[in-house]
């Protein structure tokens, strides 16, 4: 057997020492709940890694493009990158670690113990989502630099728009990562209290950095116009829309083969 099980009440000390699992209540039904919790722990770790890596890919892509294509100035300054990694990355990642158990987690087949974390399209998903976040940040920078701002304040406004877009993208993106396949509206937008708190704390702190004059000096930000705010919010919410559409397409592809398998036996009987 892969796992040795011993009874915690009636079992001997020898069997408890030799066993991999000890049932403290002598109830085999406890194993089901233990497996469920174990799968949830693994899934939540995977979600946190997904979130952190995809966000970091977005940050790296932004700086990489600015370096390779010789931008006049960097879209983000060092203190802003530190802020992103210490505040807006960490709080949602911690909240993903306590995500409630997803519906249907026990319907999945057992996972191979030697399976890589990056199988099943996981690496591709976090890569394209990270690229999307990076491109949206660059779009905000170019709009602020060349379209929306006055020439004298172009770079400061572009830097602020890029910083705000990247931060809000990451905060909104945390909600996308809560489920690999289920819609955010199906699992409940506010069903994880820890995520709600992380989002509100991160949003409040980011608004302070963008709007409070002493913090604006520290983080090299400037006040944004209503139009610039509207553009930032539209870009920041884009990952939610795109990821929800991708999930819907993935669910549709899964349902079609399942329906075909159900219809095939009926056709065979005829």
Place the predicted regions along the sequence by residue:
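Acidic, divalent-metal-coordinating active-site segment for phosphoryl/phosphodiester hydrolysis
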Residues: 1
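Membrane-embedded transport module
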Residues: 8-182
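C-terminal transmembrane module of polytopic membrane proteins
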Residues: 97, 164-270
């Amino acid at each position: 057997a892969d796992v040795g099980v011993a009874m915690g009440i009636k079992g001997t000390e020898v069997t408890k020492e030799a066993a991999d699992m000890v049932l403290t209540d002598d109830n085999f039904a406890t194993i089901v709940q233990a497996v469920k919790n174990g799968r949830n722990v693994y899934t939540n770790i995977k979600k946190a890694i997904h979130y952190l890596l995809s966000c970091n890919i977005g940050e790296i892509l932004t700086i990489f493009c600015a370096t390779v294509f010789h931008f006049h100035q960097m879209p983000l300054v060092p203190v802003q990158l530190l802020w992103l990694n210490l505040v807006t990355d960490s709080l949602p990642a911690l909240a993903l670690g306590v995500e409630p158990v997803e519906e249907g987690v026990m319907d999945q087949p057992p996972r191979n113990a030697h399976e890589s974390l990056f199988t099943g399209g996981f690496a591709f998903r976090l890569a394209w989502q990270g690229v999307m976040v990076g491109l949206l940040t660059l779009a905000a920078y170019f709009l602020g630099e060349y379209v929306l701002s006055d020439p004298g304040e172009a770079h400061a406004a572009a830097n602020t728009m890029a910083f705000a877009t990247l931060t809000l993208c990451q905060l909104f993106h945390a909600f996308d990562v809560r489920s690999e396949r289920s819609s955010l509206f199906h699992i409940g937008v506010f069903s994880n209290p820890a995520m709600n708190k992380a989002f509100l704390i991160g949003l409040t702190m980011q608004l302070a950095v963008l709007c409070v004059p002493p913090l604006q000096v520290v983080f090299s930000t400037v006040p944004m116009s209503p139009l610039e705010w509207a553009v930032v919010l539209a870009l920041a919410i884009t990952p939610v829309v795109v990821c929800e559409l991708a999930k819907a397409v993935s669910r549709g592809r899964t349902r079609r083969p399942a329906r075909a398998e159900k219809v095939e036996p009926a056709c065979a009987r005829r």
